[in-house]
Regions:
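Short glycine/serine/threonine-rich phosphate/pyrophosphate-binding segments
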Residues: 12-23, 46-47, 91-92, 103-119, ...
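Accessory alpha-helical/coil subdomains and C-terminal extensions
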Residues: 97, 108-110, 116-120, 148-167, ...
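Glycine-rich oxoanion-binding loops at beta->alpha junctions
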Residues: 48-106, 146-153, 157, 357
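N-terminal phosphate-binding or glycine-rich loops at protein starts, especially the Walker A/P-loop
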Residues: 1-50
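Short glycine-rich or small-residue beta-strand-to-loop segments that form or flank ligand, phosphate
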Residues: 3-11, 69-71, 104-109, 173-176
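Phosphate-binding loop/pocket of nucleotide- and phosphate-handling active sites
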Residues: 261, 316-357
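Short, acidic/small-residue loops that bind anionic groups at enzyme active sites
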Residues: 121-145, 199-206
Length: 357
């Protein structure tokens, strides 16, 4: 009898169910006796023994279903060693649940914070396999994360829709795209959506350069401008501040997000009406796109093979079009950021896209 636990942690995305399905279908097809324990609401389920035994029926018809059938929650890594309000040792509780159920392995689906806790559990002696989930595409060691392509599609659609109204009213429009620390989603959606200006966390912007780019378009007879702005975009002035100083500034800011500050500064300089559109959590929602369905089926199948090989302590990555087992110890806690000198940035700039630098 092979007993495997599974949980989804952190922010949801479109392809979590597809990834779990890939794991279970491959295991069910190749392992004679199998029990799947689904922990509810992420690490909380593992800590407080909230789980249910899943059957193949639970994974039928979920390939196209967004969200997660197990539920999810955020359990910050920095608090994992801190006892809960009742004094419970969370790490010890997770180990106890794992051993009490007699699990052979635990498949954890999540992003960077989830991955760090997965590695902690590996260090504590649990058999762990991590599947890289995030719309941000910022997990080190894999070329792509599941959820990223689906989110690109939604963010691109948002920019596409703004184009028509911006053109009709000769407006400057900012579309705010998810991504506090990295700009992968904004970069890809911005290029795909034909944004004229793209602002990323990795490339601090000069507001004067942004204004010049808009002014240049106006002089060329182009009455509207589209900006794709990441949630974590930062000006050169703010980038020069210490982390503590920047946090203080944000706490005192009158703006709900950086996009509104950018809009205000453009409006002040050019006297133009600037509108902001925020697709927000729609970027996490809906059905996974075909690419993510294929990716998750492959990653899930590869995770099942690692389980059958009893090769744990790894993340199942996609590298050069091939699935690969990457040691968790080598990647946990590392962030994959956009390289400002990358070929893609250079190619985008060659087409006239302004990055504010």
């Amino acid at each position: 009898m092979k007993k495997i636990g599974m949980l989804t942690s952190g922010g949801d995305c479109q392809a979590l169910n597809a990834a779990m399905r890939g794991v279970v279908k491959a295991l069910a097809h190749n392992v004679d006796e199998l029990e799947i324990y689904g922990f509810e609401n992420g690490y909380k389920g593992l800590i407080y023994e909230n789980y249910r035994i899943l059957t193949s029926k639970d994974f039928s018809g979920i390939l196209t279903k967004g969200g997660t059938i197990l539920g999810s929650s955020r359990q910050p890594f920095k608090l994992m060693r801190v006892p809960d309000e009742n004094g419970l040792d969370k790490v010890a509780a997770m180990k106890n649940t794992y051993k009490k159920l007699g699990l052979d392995g635990l498949v954890i689906l999540g992003g960077n914070g989830t991955q760090k806790t997965a590695n902690l559990l590996r260090e504590e002696g649990l058999n762990i396999i991590h599947l890289p989930k995030t719309i941000d595409n910022d997990i080190y060691g894999t070329d792509v994360t599941f959820g990223f392509q689906s989110a690109i599609n939604i963010a691109t659609d948002a920019i596409d829709c703004i184009h028509t109204t911006a053109a009709s009213h000769n407006r400057v429009f900012i579309v705010e795209v998810m991504g506090h620390k990295v700009g992968w989603l904004t970069l890809y959606a911005g290029v795909a959506g034909g944004a004229d200006i793209i602002l990323l966390p990795e490339i601090p912007y000069d507001i004067d350069k942004v204004v010049d780019a808009i002014h240049k378009r106006t002089k060329e007879g182009k009455g509207f401008t589209i900006l794709a702005v990441a949630e974590g975009a930062i000006s050169k002035e703010d980038a020069a501040l210490s982390k503590k100083e920047y946090k203080k500034k944000l706490a005192k800011s009158k703006y709900p997000s950086v996009s509104y500050e950018v809009a205000d500064r453009i409006s002040e300089r050019l006297g133009l009406e600037v509108r902001v559109a925020v697709p927000g959590h729609t970027q996490r929602g809906g059905s996974p796109c075909p690419y993510d369905r294929v990716l998750c089926t492959r990653l899930g199948s590869a995770a099942a093979k690692a389980i059958m090989d009893e090769d744990y302590g790894c993340m199942i990555a996609m590298v050069n079009g091939q699935t690969k087992r990457v040691p968790l110890a080598d990647v946990a806690g590392k962030l994959k950021t956009v390289d400002p000198k990358s070929q893609m940035i250079k190619e985008a700039k060659r087409t006239g896209i302004c990055f504010g630098d």
